Each structure stands twice: as C-alpha cells, then as structure tokens.
Design a protein with these regions (language model features):
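Conserved catalytic submotifs in the C-terminal HATPase_c
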Residues: 36-48
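Conserved ATP-binding N-box helix of the HATPase_c
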Residues: 51-82, 142-143
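A short beta-strand-to-loop micro-motif at the C-terminal edge of the catalytic HATPase_c
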Residues: 84-86, 149, 153-163
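Conserved glycine-/histidine-rich ATP-lid loop and adjacent helix of the Bergerat-fold HATPase_c
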Residues: 136-153
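C-terminal end segment of the histidine kinase catalytic
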Residues: 159-184
Length: 184
C-alpha cells in the first residue's frame, strides 16, 4: 500500500535518549560507515539526546567522505576524531584521515575551494544537492544549521600531502549539551 511505502522513507521515532557522549556518536557512525575511528580526545561532556541522530549523521558523512575520497582501501584508512572544549565555551571537532599522496597541497586545496565558498549559502546548497544528489559537506551544514540549529564554522582541506582534516567549530553549544538540572 501507499502508506507502507511512505513509511519506508520516514525515520522511526525512537524513544528519546536523555543524553549521549561524543564516543557514542563516533561508535555508531564508524560502524555504519564501516570505518575504524580512533577517538584521540573526548571531554567529559554529555549532549542532549534529541540530537543523537543529527550528530551521528554528521560523523557518518565525515567518515564516509574519508573512506570514499581518500583514495585508499578502507583497511589502510586511519581516521582520528577529537572534540575539545575551548575556554570561550565553543566546541571544536576535528576529524583527520590519511589519504593518497597529493603532489601539490595548494592545488589540491584550491580544487575544493568551491565547497568552502559555498558552505552555508542556502541557494548554492540547494543547487548542489539537486544537481549532484547531495554533497556530504552540505549535509553536515543542514544537520548542524537546520536540524540542530547551532552556529558553526567549518574548515577542511589537505594539511599535508597525505593528511586531510575537517575542523568544525560550534559556537555557543549550550543548546546541544545535556544539563541534568534542565532535563528533570
């Protein structure tokens, strides 16, 4: 029936989880992407459980992009993820992966300037998603900006000939953090 078919494309409403850790989102996303990710730094903070799916989506995109764009077989891929709480209160997420060596770091970074320049631009994002079937980087923007509603910046590119890094800085993350006193 039409009702059954439409349910295939609707996310099931799961019982809400009160809180989750960064490590939980990493574990779920890395298993889904079939990527081994090492958590190199994790502050002792908890996120509001209603944002688990969105954070897993963000991490999944980062891991899947690492696997599909690195030019390496998955068994040779090395992914590290870290989350740091900055003194000003922002959170910095850094995901790094090894990749096939690039001859010219500057040229390789210039080749992805379009994505950097377009990130956060609603009109360009819609066009890219419609034409290209959706770029992962724009799915990250949608999850963080639209689904979670957190102000953020993103930097990504080749740090060296064999290392690609994505850094997300989330400003004023209090809305996504779990506060026990508020949850009661």
């Amino acid at each position: 029936t039409l009702e059954a078919i439409s349910s295939w494309f609707t996310r099931a409403e799961a019982p809400e989880i009160a809180e989750f850790s960064f490590g939980t989102a990493i574990e779920i996303a890395s298993r889904s992407a079939n990527v081994t990710a090492v958590v190199s730094d994790e502050p002792g903070i908890a996120f509001n459980g209603k944002h688990l799916t969105s954070f897993v989506d963000v991490m999944y995109v980062l891991f899947e992009n690492a696997a599909s764009k690195s030019g390496l077989p998955r068994e040779k891929l090395q992914v590290t993820a870290s989350l740091c709480e900055e003194p000003a209160g922002s959170l910095t997420l850094r995901v790094a992966n090894n990749c096939e060596m690039v001859a010219d770091v500057g040229a390789a970074n210039a080749a992805i300037d379009y994505y950097r320049d377009a990130y956060g631009n609603d009109d360009v994002t819609r066009t890219v998603i419609q034409q290209n079937g959706g770029s992962g980087i724009f799915r990250i923007w949608r999850c963080l900006s639209k689904d979670i509603g957190i102000k953020h910046t993103i930097e990504f590119g080749y740090e060296s000939e064999g290392l690609f890094v994505v850094t997300l800085k989330m400003q004023e993350p209090t809305g996504v953090l779990y506060h026990e006193s508020i949850a009661r």
